[in-house]
Amino acid sequence: MTQIRIEPLTADAFAPFGDVLAPKPAPDRMINAGRCERHHALATVERHGGEAIISIFRSDPVSLPYECALLERHPFGSQAFMPMGQGAWLSVVAPDVDGHPGTPRGFLVPSGVGVNLRAGVWHGVLTPLDHAADFLVVDREGDGVNLQEVTIPPVVFDR
């Protein structure tokens, strides 16, 4: 079974798959009479032919080492995941190789940080590490089949 070392999440390392949703070192501007920092346009919602919707997903925790054998993608829209509580989580993503997932990568997402996956990016299921977690999810709803799931030879992610 293939073993994959979990990587720290950085904007540069994650860029081929999407965006890191975290405050910038400095805000783009101050709003609300100078009481609120606005970190503007951290990601774009892709919604080819549909509407952007907001949902809450509740996911059970996983333990490391974590075995992954299922990937999915959403060809018509991006999908953003923002944890609503504290705790690190694992984001599993893979490049597309001729319509199939390539070698997966695992990123350790720190507590309070989210990610936005571009349309068509292969990814694993939600994997909070410490405890069950709720995630605010922004994605697309509309016509067309916007979910493709595939099984892959199992890979194990660990630190």
What are these regions (language model features)?
Residues 108-124:
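Conserved metal-binding segment of the jelly-roll/cupin
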Residues 1-106, 130, 138-139, 143-150, ...:
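Non-catalytic, conserved peripheral segments adjacent to functional cores
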Residues 120-136:
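Ligand-binding loop in jelly-roll beta-barrel domains
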